[in-house]
């Protein structure tokens, strides 16, 4: 249906068997985002997993203030959510926060509650999207395992939550 596609995940074996090729174009990292008033500036991969599993529920458990953690997720089919599910491996994410949205004739639809910069909030997004495209004000990225998500640390692979971004083409298509 198209000549070129983009993906934040590698091709599955069955997709390759259908004649698709993948070429790495760039790398991006999943940035962990918190409210700028949050005193936590670094989280371990283990603690991020525990937060999103629901085992750590208060910032004081990771060196912050005595405040409930509000862990936001991305919609199920988004690239950053797919990356987070991959990162979590066999550990399932806890049920996401949801909002009920009213859409005229469709009635009420439940949607995943995406990051809102409120006290206690934590979220994640591709670093480039957060810092380069949206330039969200009033939120801060934090380090993971002591490494801040810079272009250099992502490109070198030093930052621990990195994914290649792929160009997908059809074999033999010039």
Where is each model-derived feature located?
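Exported/periplasmic ABC-transporter solute-binding proteins
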Residues: 1-174
